[in-house]
Regions:
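Core mixed alpha/beta domains of very large multi-subunit molecular machines
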Residues: 2-350, 354-367, 461-480
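C-terminal catalytic or substrate-handling cores of phosphate/nucleotide-
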Residues: 344, 354-480
Length: 480
């Protein structure tokens, strides 16, 4: 038993793994007894392996790049794998967001799926929106695959899945080898995300829908409060009321409303042969209509309303008949979703019908053909300011779009702000010149027009200007 620091005289009993021949007294040498948090078992505890080992590298001769001109733009971010290859097996998943080390110097990132029609001698196809002539393994300013980071603990610059991100297989010689697949997320991970309605989406919908969902949220909170008040143990009641109050404070900041029936997050996968008006979504009824919403959400013009077609043969072949949390759409639909790509982007899927009316509008003319990576990418480092605070900048432009929408800005103005938001969201990841976008899209003038104000002392301010965008801002409360 290990003595409890905060409870003198009490102890916690633990199991200690030790080599054969260890004396009983040595298991009480607590300074040398460590937890197994950095290890993982693949066989129910019979053996343990490090939770992370440096990734195995794939020979680039095994892969092919499908460039934009060859159709790569329609599947940008997708990694197609030959089925049945042991070191490229996705385990129990039909799809996963992965990283694969190549030649020890570069890596590919994106959504991995199986393809049963790969050319002979090719085990992997990487789809890109970059043009022919871009080297597969070039320098950091001119390459399809990304250079690895100089960090033995995190060569991909983003952490892989904590448990199960790496796996092992038995090769033809009977030896255990590390798989080439490093998962960030896999089938089943996206559907478990929170399904509340964000104020970013709800504030741009008709008032009856807003009232309905907020009233449901209020009713849920009232029921929770009544349940706590019915408790008879004063100590438990006090703790529960404090937790309830904290939750209410947080809810007032984040402004999330009750979910609509059957709405769920799903990861998007490309099906180029899918019609512009259809979606492959086996978690929904064939023939019903659904709305797709991607965050950050600019407005109704980013909401495609699609008919579920679960009989589409290509989709069944790629995604399977029973995916846990994926839908299939074509590239045109993805472009309407504020320029989504297929490297792990997600959408909120909302079934529509007589009881759920989602307001949607045609895509903005000012967004047609706009590709932020082509317009603002590819510049040599050192010639522009590199984005380092995506969350902050994204918050600013999201608030601007919300305020402009609520205050009645015209479509041309909103298109400028949305174009800039599309640049900002990918600026850090794809090294885009977001400052030039800020100039080209007149962001300073838009902020002045739609967010500029004077306080009671005559001082000029810019920033969040409506209740929705100001909800997360701090304010000073006068003493009473």
């Amino acid at each position: 038993g290990v003595p409890q620091v905060t409870n003198p005289g009490k102890q916690t009993n633990i199991k200690v793994l030790c080599p054969p021949g260890t004396e009983h007294k040595d298991i009480y040498d607590f300074e040398n007894v460590h937890s197994l948090q950095d290890y993982i078992s693949y066989d129910s505890g019979d053996t343990f392996k490090p939770a992370f080992v440096y990734p195995a590298s794939m020979d680039s001769k095994r892969m092919k790049v499908r460039y934009a001109e060859e159709g790569g733009v329609d599947k940008d971010g997708v990694i197609e794998l030959r089925r049945g290859v042991k070191d490229l097996d996705l385990g129990n998943s039909n799809y996963a967001q992965v990283r694969i080390l190549v030649d020890g110097t570069h890596y590919m990132k994106g959504m991995a799926i199986y393809n049963d029609d790969l050319p002979k001698g090719v085990d992997v196809i990487f789809n890109t929106n970059k043009s022919k002539g871009t080297p597969m393994l070039g320098d950091k300013n001119n390459t399809v695959l990304k250079l690895i980071k100089n960090d033995p603990e995190n060569p991909f610059g983003s952490l892989i899945k904590e448990h199960g991100g790496q796996s092992y297989y038995i090769d033809k010689d009977g030896k255990e080898k590390l798989s080439l697949i490093n998962k960030r997320a896999e089938e089943g991970d996206w559907g478990s995300w929170s399904d509340h309605l964000s104020s970013q989406f709800l504030s741009k919908q008709p008032l009856p829908l807003i009232k309905k969902q907020l009233n449901m949220s209020a009713a849920d909170k009232q029921a929770e409060f009544d349940e706590i008040c019915a408790l008879t143990n004063p100590t438990v009641k006090k703790a529960m009321l404090k937790s309830f109050a904290d939750d209410c404070d947080a809810a007032a900041v984040h402004l999330k409303a009750a979910a609509l029936p059957r709405q769920k997050y799903q990861v998007i996968l490309p099906i180029p042969s899918m019609k512009d008006t259809e979606v492959y979504a086996p978690n929904y009824k064939d023939g019903e209509q659904v709305a797709l919403v991607r965050y950050p959400h600019g407005g109704r013009f980013e909401i495609p309303i699609l008919t579920v077609n679960n009989r589409q043969k290509d989709a069944v072949k790629v995604i399977g008949k029973n995916p846990i949390d994926a839908v299939g759409i074509n590239g045109k639909v993805a472009a309407q979703l504020s320029g989504a790509d297929f490297d792990g982007d997600t959408v909120m899927v909302i079934p529509t019908g007589k009881n759920v009316k989602i307001a949607a509008e045609p895509p903005l003319k000012g967004l047609e053909g706009f590709d932020p990576k082509l317009k603002y990418g590819g510049k040599p480092e050192g010639t522009f300011k590199v984005m380092k605070n995506t969350q902050t900048e994204m918050g600013k432009v999201s608030n601007l779009i919300t305020d402009m929408t609520l205050k009645g800005a015209n479509q041309e103005e909103i298109a400028k702000a949305v174009r800039h938001s599309m640049v900002v969201i990918d600026a850090e990841k794809h090294k885009l010149d977001y400052k030039q976008s800020e100039i080209d899209n007149d962001i300073a003038a838009l902020k002045k027009k739609w967010q500029g104000s004077y306080d009671k002392d005559g001082r000029y301010h810019e920033g969040a200007a409506t209740l929705i965008s100001r909800s997360s801002s701090e304010t000073q409360v006068l003493k009473r």
